[in-house]
Amino acid sequence: IFMSNLIISKKNEVYLHVNAEPHVYYELADQFTFELPDAKFMPQYKSKYWDGKIRLFNTQTGQIYVGLLDRVVQFCKDHEYTYQFKESEFYGLPFEVNDFISKEGVKDYMFSICKHSPREYQIEGVYDALRHNRKLLISPTASGKSLMIYSIVRYYVEKKQSILIVVPTTSLVEQMYKDFADYGWDVGSYCHKIYAGKERETDSQVIITTWQSIYKLPRKYFERFSVVIGDEAHQFKSKSLVSIMSKLSDAKYRFGFTGTLDGTQTHKWVLEGLFGASYKIIKTDELMKKGHLAKLNINILLLKHSPNKFETFEDEIQYIIGHNRRNNFIKNLALDLKGNTLILYARVEGHGQPPVSYTHLRAHETP
């Protein structure tokens, strides 16, 4: 009987189980191991307690995050290994598509639940998410992310599912609650907010919370949720996000939203593993072309200085910061520009203070 090299099944909604020969385990371990760029600054690394590497495949248990299934399949293709999916009695197949979802159906639904007309790429994003049950959606600033989250929430509310929405700050909890109300929903009947000082126990179908408020809660608290949505997922601390998402072992539907995967606190593969394969909804330049964002013009003004030698880099910085002609040039440029002017400094204390005449500019100094 022909046997596949890898037999892949679901342990739960967090982990896949891979059954394979030991040598395949070690190849998988190599494939799914990466070094953290900032590891050398961490106490565990300095004390030689940890080698600075994150291992996403466990050779002892044969487990890997469900969201990395596409990458495991690609690994098999690259290494010419055969694989098969084995169905779990409780969790089904590792890869499932919701065939009941159609693009036209999503479009009609989004128009019916919202006072604002959804854009084509928003419909595409919601369709892709609902069809695949889990996704990491990359959605730039001003792309209308909250409308997409709202549409996903409304769909699962109608399916009588309990939904957990996790955001990084209390202001985002309030903002999302307000956005849902603005879209015309009776938000008070369905949603409950949790952050410092707010009650955690509730019968509400939808909970909007900061990750800081819930990551230490016991596993039992998370049992009732079948849907989890992480907004601004790149801002979550890796350990806390893993803690929350690992406790949601029965949450079949997982959606992460992030503006970028560059410079994330949590590695891209960890985010994909916890939520699902990434899907880029639209790029910022496309938003500009379509007129959804103001067009951006960048003019680079290069000020040339006469040659000078400095002992240290800091001496050079101080010379530039304190250069009167340069500071006057910036001041006059800002005064000549029409409309609102924003002046950004890397060092507000040193950079923004010297020209006293800056203070009468109607501009904001932002660190």
Feature map (PLM): residue ranges:
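Conserved pre-motif I regulatory segment
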Residues: 94-135
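Walker A/P-loop
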Residues: 132-152
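Conserved strand-helix element at the start of the C-terminal RecA-like helicase core
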Residues: 164-166, 170-172, 333-356
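Conserved helix-turn-beta segment of the N-terminal RecA-like "Helicase ATP-binding" lobe
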Residues: 172-193
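Conserved helix/coil segment N-terminal to the catalytic DExD/H
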Residues: 197-224, 242
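Post-DEXD/H (motif II) to motif III coupling segment of the RecA-like Helicase ATP-binding lobe
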Residues: 238-293
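Conserved interdomain hinge at the start of the Helicase C-terminal
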Residues: 312-341
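Single conserved hydrophobic/aromatic residue that forms the stacking wall/gate
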Residues: 360-367
